[in-house]
Amino acid sequence: MTAQILDGKTLAQQFEQEMRLRVDVLKAKANGHTPILATILVGADPASATYVKMKGNACQRVGMESVAIELSEETTTAQLLAKIDELNNNQDVHGILLQHPVPAQIDERACFDAISLEKDVDGVTCLGFGRMSMGEAAYGCATPKGIMRLLEHYQVELEGKHAVVVGRSAILGKPMAMMMLEANATVTICHSRTQNLPELVKQADIVVGAVGKPEFIKADWIKDGAVVVDAGFHPERCGDIELAPLVDRVAAYTPVPGGVGPMTINTLIFQTLQSGEKAFG
């Protein structure tokens, strides 16, 4: 069996070309103004700084602007909330990204939820998640939404299929399950307390690795002909799924790197563009 590669890197590049055309149209209509993404980085974590830079570069590639706000490691919850409130009230800003994780003294959930729904382009607020869960309009969490866009492009059928999501985080596993449920898949969510995890994964037509541990999901847990989506990325340049033994016996898979990651960033930028289009009418 020759597996289909769900190439997120190439798809993101294609989407960027389409987005640039939309940005050009918007700028012509808005007297040269363009959507602006504000990124907030608290502390000096090198990986987080790299991710923020990548998001700024992606904005630039499609003709949008980004504003990078860097706060000290000692920033308090109150100080961060004040900065978010300032950005909420800045009509020139169309999207707000608070880079995860923040220092331990900060109430991250409170700060996520302080982002206005209209500017929650990373899909991290409880209000946005609740609306999405009820089938109402809201920006989706960037990684699961990026996965859905990837699966849609490659025409991976979800309706009637059994999807197993391994991981239940608030910004990945849970919204991933809800989006797949909305697409009429039958969804099982697994986590660290799940019993008989290998047996459950073996039942899956579609497996989503969202557990945050390198190659935690073993190749022999996955049945022939399944679709494998790996949302993990680790310093060893591997994901959450033991991928190498699978490439000759699954129907399709996301490579690591080059699969889910580029689509996460692309979705963040796309949703910022959508926010800008709404703001400019």
Curated annotation (Swiss-Prot):
NADP(+) binds at G167, R168, S169, S192. One of its GO terms (molecular function) is methenyltetrahydrofolate cyclohydrolase activity. Homodimer. The keyword Amino-acid biosynthesis applies. One of its GO terms (biological process) is L-histidine biosynthetic process. Keywords: Amino-acid biosynthesis, Histidine biosynthesis, Hydrolase, Methionine biosynthesis, Multifunctional enzyme, NADP, One-carbon metabolism, Oxidoreductase, Purine biosynthesis. This is Bifunctional protein FolD.
